């Protein structure tokens, strides 16, 4: 029985790929609904007009294809990097951070077109279904959300491929002559899952990596770059002021050429299972190292340590899909306040998968060489003061030791 009989018009997050092309036809045939397609250019590097052509062939009248690269980096990626956010110590959240923006536009387009539902192609096993829907409900509590993977009878990607063949929907092939890996990509990263990658004991084939040279084949000569920061955001490379998306794209090029940003990860999904993914985040890996380096000069110790304590919770909120939650916004306000004086330049050496800090400088620096010098500090610091500092900090330890000696 069709539980969506009252749905007349649906906005579909449409990539033009296998899953969403099948979903489009399923929405038309099973629901009898009018479908509006929305394709976001987040820097995935694909020719998006093919999505328009596929949608037109399938009878779609309202087609939205939008370049959201600048908004994506400015309003989502950069705020996240101010926090130095990584999930489970290593994952730079490239997929997670893209979902709130897509959901935001789905809701906006639904209102513009009079649609009463939105739809996405995330499976019932993954995190993306949660991220899309939590974001959508945060922006429109009454929106209807259709997740075909949770409703239809297909059980696997093999079933989808057979459906596609029956309905003459093209299926692209990868280098092994089989159906493609499950791939997600945007300006921040790319990820690959599925097929041979589902066995975490087997190394990922080299052809899975789409965005980086292997460190072994990267140039033998290092690349030196300087990144400029203002209020915690990267604003320039080698002295040239750049827009957020242009800057990240250039960092991606540097990272690609030097084999930087590869990650083979088994992660804990929000839904409770573990999954294995191959991630490439070349520009983001460079940016994270540079941002931490400029913070080391300009952030007070207390603020820096508190940020590091809050970061895992902040990263978890993004990974789980709570970008629009009050707690994420509260943390963001604190993080943004901490970035007021985070400005200056960081010089990096990029070499065969490594990002090495060569130097950093800032007019807002809290590093004073007269305080730390091993030479004559001309009275800037009286070493005798350390004795009282140590004695007071040792008081509770001495008290504990005294009690132990009595016992």
Curated annotation (Swiss-Prot):
Record InterPro entries: Arginosuc_syn_C, Arginosuc_syn_N, Arginosuc_synth, Arginosuc_synth_CS, Arginosuc_synth_type_1_subfam, AS_cat/multimer_dom_body, Rossmann-like_a/b/a_fold
PANTHER family the record matches: ARGININOSUCCINATE SYNTHASE
Keyword Nucleotide-binding listed: yes
GO molecular function: argininosuccinate synthase activity; ATP binding
Pfam families for this protein: Arginosuc_syn_C, Arginosuc_synth
Main location: cytoplasm
Cellular localization per UniProt: Cytoplasm
Alphabetically ordered keywords of this record: Amino-acid biosynthesis, Arginine biosynthesis, ATP-binding, Cytoplasm, Ligase, Nucleotide-binding
Reactions accelerated catalytically: L-citrulline + L-aspartate + ATP = 2-(N(omega)-L-arginino)succinate + AMP + diphosphate + H(+)
GO cellular component, as recorded: cytoplasm
Biological pathway: Amino-acid biosynthesis; L-arginine biosynthesis; L-arginine from L-ornithine and carbamoyl phosphate: step 2/3
Stated family: Belongs to the argininosuccinate synthase family. Type 1 subfamily.
Protein name per its UniProtKB record: Argininosuccinate synthase
Binding of ATP, residues: 13-21, 40, 121
Assembly and interaction partners: Homotetramer.
Record-listed L-citrulline binding positions: 91, 96, 127, 131, 182, 191, 267, 279
EC numbers on record: 6.3.4.5
UniProt GO BP: argininosuccinate metabolic process; L-arginine biosynthetic process; urea cycle
Residues involved in L-aspartate binding: 123, 127-128
